[in-house]
Amino acid sequence: MKKILILGTALLCGFLCRVAAQGVEFRDLTFGQALEQARTENKLVFMDCYTSWCGPCKNMLKNVFTLPEAGEFMNAHFVCVKYDMEKGEGIGLKKQFAVRAFPTFFIIRPDGTVQHRLAGGSQWERFRERVARGLEETTSYAYLNERYQQGKLARKQYPHYVQALKDAGDRPAVKNVCMEVFGQLSDKAKCSAENWYIFDQEMGPADPRFEYLSLIHI
């Protein structure tokens, strides 16, 4: 009996190791089935929106999502699916989620609402950081954007909100929020280290922030 238990444990460990080693498991599910599976497994849905001609999309699928460490992390937290935005169900999903660039990735709750949005690919280490922000409710795009729209976003949360907007690829919103904060801060506060993020985002020579920096001596 003891030998059987040991053998069973060894086989299970071997199976789990192989699952992790295979990289991210993209399941062959419809979007509705993915949401249902996420409810069953108490996970979120990770959706990869790609096209057949997109070079960065191919790079993510071939060189990033195939990594064992990517599989270990992603498979533990998500029901992962991918859809070609120009074929089948992907055509409707592209419109539903307003996908404008490729690749775009979504972290979606089991009720179908978006928790976080990621525009563009990257190397695994950086991509993991971006995904991790979306996993954490208080640093996710949905949470921070809702707080902002309600006028309840605390000053210390603004850097996280700007980062979430960057993750989503919303460059106009990044600039608008940084300009908003810039206009509200005193000169002393603008020079404070925790507020320097407003000068690091979407700033050109004609920007008031650029003019401000040119007039001060640091």
Describe each PLM feature range.
Residues 88-102:
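Structural alpha/beta surface segment adjacent to cysteine/selenocysteine redox centers
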Residues 1-25:
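Bacterial Sec-dependent N-terminal signal peptides
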Residues 54, 216-218:
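Conserved small/polar residues in nucleotide/adenosyl-binding loops
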Residues 41-52:
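Short active-site neighborhood of thiol/selenol oxidoreductases, capturing the structured segment around
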Residues 100-140:
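Non-catalytic, surface beta->alpha helical segment in thiol-disulfide oxidoreductase systems
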Residues 22-41:
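N-terminal leader/targeting and pre-domain segments
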Residues 148-216:
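Oxidative protein folding and maturation machinery
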Residues 25-29, 67-89:
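Thiol-based oxidoreductase modules, predominantly thioredoxin-like and allied folds used
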